Amino acid sequence: MYGSARTITNLEGSPSRSPRLPRSPRLGHRRTSSGGGGGTGKTLSMENIQSLNAAYATSGPMYLSDHEGVASTTYPKGTMTLGRATNRAVYGGRVTAMGSSPNIASAGLSHTDVLSYTDQHGGLTGSSHHHHHQVPSMLRQVRDSTMLDLQAQLKELQRENDLLRKELDIKDSKLGSSMNSIKTFWSPELKKERVLRKEEAARMSVLKEQMRVSHEENQHLQLTIQALQDELRTQRDLNHLLQQESGNRGAEHFTIELTEENFRRLQAEHDRQAKELFLLRKTLEEMELRIETQKQTLNARDESIKKLLEMLQSKGLPSKSLEDDNERTRRMAEAESQVSHLEVILDQKEKENIHLREELHRRSQLQPEPAKTKALQTVIEMKDTKIASLERNIRDLEDEIQMLKANGVLNTEDREEEIKQIEVYKSHSKFMKTKIDQLKQELSKKESELLALQTKLETLSNQNSDCKQHIEVLKESLTAKEQRAAILQTEVDALRLRLEEKESFLNKKTKQLQDLTEEKGTLAGEIRDMKDMLEVKERKINVLQKKIENLQEQLRDKDKQLTNLKDRVKSLQTDSSNTDTALATLEEALSEKERIIERLKEQRERDDRERLEEIESFRKENKDLKEKVNALQAELTEKESSLIDLKEHASSLASAGLKRDSKLKSLEIAIEQKKEECSKLEAQLKKAHNIEDDSRMNPEFADQIKQLDKEASYYRDECGKAQAEVDRLLEILKEVENEKNDKDKKIAELESLTLRHMKDQNKKVANLKHNQQLEKKKNAQLLEEVRRREDSMADNSQHLQIEELMNALEKTRQELDATKARLASTQQSLAEKEAHLANLRIERRKQLEEILEMKQEALLAAISEKDANIALLELSASKKKKTQEEVMALKREKDRLVHQLKQQTQNRMKLMADNYDDDHHHYHHHHHHHHHRSPGRSQHSNHRPSPDQDDEEGIWA
């Protein structure tokens, strides 16, 4: 009817109990002990008054620390698993010492899931076994943290054992005092006290058994710690062997996979935490509504308790003069009506309490109880204990009323016994008055304490609302940072893909460059062979020209002889006086001379034919050489176009490098912001620690401090991961810049080769011009000789040969004009290519200047960040070694960055000076372009930025 046992069992069903562990064996004992205090005596016993006094004197709420569990909870030996726990570590339960009476139910200790923290860390170790050969340091840290947590839990269990022993001693002393008081004052209650002693002995045995179980559990935890240490040793040995086997084969690939897996795992944990936070918000709102309803019910209960106390005071004290039976019956009727009304109210309140406890139990199974509900639950339990004591008093009064009715209506003879009992009441009324006064004083104290607690509750609720708002702001910032981290991760993935594409494109270009160099070598060999062929042909032409000159001299001699002979013939004709013999001799001589002339003519015709054949062969060879020269020029144009494409690709790579530098800057700025937020969170943690020192009795601040610690550690991990990702991207950029420098060197080599090739072509063209001029001179001499011979020779064959020679000369002139036009076109294309090269160099200088400016800006930003961090650490005014070491490390990094900034400024000044010299040289080069074309090109092409500048590109802070 009164439901005292139900309230206790609902309290004992601890909402924070782990689902893996069994229920505590103390529950059955509490069920048996809660119903053992039924009202059997006729009057309000002295033992009940003393128990009420002890309860109100010692029933203040006691809070354990955040990680302290109660040692009376029992676990079987095989229930400790190392899987991932779903529940968090529960805050410490409330302990209430309720005096020596078993009639007042003591509230149950909340079951704390001691192994949830070890389960959580065990799950971490289980997940880290999969990548143990990849991340040994992470696994060691996790294992060390689990070992430290287990040792801390062992220490806490030992401390709780000591506390339980102290409680046992206190209960023994209270039992002894209560027994002495019973023996001295109330001998009729000895039988009842024997039963109570038996129950207390049973409780003592249960407590001893629980101590034994906790001791066994401590031993079991020590064994598990030893097993974990053995596992650590074996895993370290395995890790050492795997590291020796794997070596340095795929370190970068593993780190990339690890970071991606860590990122995915962190993302999954973040989603899970977001869901839990959403559920927690909903449950917090519902709990606040429940707390308001409970406050209203508590106010109603306070009023009912005050009424009951007034009734007890009016009922407990008998009047000095005996009144009539009518007045007594009227008082009994009023008391019965009040009791019935109070019973109805109590039933309603108990139903509401049961409903609230069930909802609290259901909510607390989903999440750990907040500190506010714990404080309210302690207040509710105190009120329940008061209500239970008042119920017992009411039952005693009802029994007394029934006895009075029976004695008053049936037995008039027993009035004398009642009068004796009233005298006994009178004798002990003074004692009861003093006790009631003490109870009133204690009630006033408790009311003042309740008011103080209400003010504390209001302040704590205000602080809780502020903390909730701050937590919501932090959560919003967390979501924004996570979104930014996701965006940065997508950008990093896109950069990786683009880097891979650029690397493949660079490999293709290197292959093309190698093919071009090989083709260039083959073409150079062919050109050398052509040069040798040309030299051989020139030697043959020289030999033939010498032969022609010798034949021409012979012809001249023969012409002279002919003229002499003609003169002689004329002289002979004039001398008609010569004899016929002389004429015969002369005719013979003439015939011989004619034969000689015919032979000479035949020999001349043969020589002319041979010369014409050689000229035709030379023409054919000249055509072949021109075709080869045209093919070489086409290949040269193709190679120059490929060079232009390579330069455009190099400029695109430089622009991509600039974009990557800008993205790296944004990443560094994001990292700086995260570091600043971490420093802010650390400052908030320090403030929270100071608040915790001021109010250690409030567990809500401890929860918030823990959450802030977790958030700070999470931000530190995120900062470390982002810093590692930035370092990896910087290394990739370094490699890309080195590859770009190699490509620039290859382009310079190709430019020098093209310049040499163009010089060789210019030399060949000059030699061809010289040879053509010599051929022109020789042809002019031949034409003059032919014209001279035209006067002496009238043969048609000679005229035909002269016409052929004239046609050949015209053809050679046309070929010379064509070669001149080609030379002009090649010179024009060379000038255009030089202008394009100059533009490319100017663009490259601009890009280098922009890169140096960006590096200087990034270094200045990094230096300002280091200054800000140093100022924050100095303002924190903490003289710890870690902060001093951090300040020293930041100063060293700042000095290194300043040194890098000096180097960058020196490089920029060098580049500006080189640009000035190059512009000055370029002006002189254009001024003497027509006179000194090839050396100007060589000097211009050799001017490139030093490789030190290329090596010093990038910020590796």
Swiss-Prot record:
SUPFAM superfamilies: Tropomyosin (SSF57997). Residues 14-25 have a biased composition (Low complexity). GO terms for biological process: maintenance of presynaptic active zone structure; regulation of calcium-dependent activation of synaptic vesicle fusion; regulation of presynaptic cytosolic calcium ion concentration; synaptic vesicle priming. Residues 1-44, 918-957 are annotated as: Disordered. It is found in: Cytoplasm; Synapse; Presynaptic active zone; Cytoplasm, Cytoskeleton. Residues 948-957 have a biased composition (Acidic residues). Signal peptide: none annotated. The keyword Cytoplasm applies. The keyword Lipoprotein does not apply. Keywords: Cell projection, Coiled coil, Cytoplasm, Cytoskeleton, Phosphoprotein, Synapse. It holds the Pfam family Cast. Residues 140-917 form a coiled coil. It comes from the Eukaryota. The modification Phosphoserine is found at residues 65, 666. Residues 1-13 have a biased composition (Polar residues). GO terms for molecular function: structural constituent of presynaptic active zone. Residues 922-943 have a biased composition (Basic residues). Interacts with BSN, ERC1, PPFIA1, PPFIA2, PPFIA3 and PPFIA4. Interacts through its C-terminus with the PDZ domain of RIMS1. Part of a complex consisting of ERC2, RIMS1 and UNC13A. Thought to be involved in the organization of the cytomatrix at the nerve terminals active zone (CAZ) which regulates neurotransmitter release. Seems to act together with BSN. May recruit liprin-alpha proteins to the CAZ. This is ERC protein 2. It comes from Homo sapiens. The lineage of its organism: Eukaryota, Metazoa, Chordata, Craniata, Vertebrata.
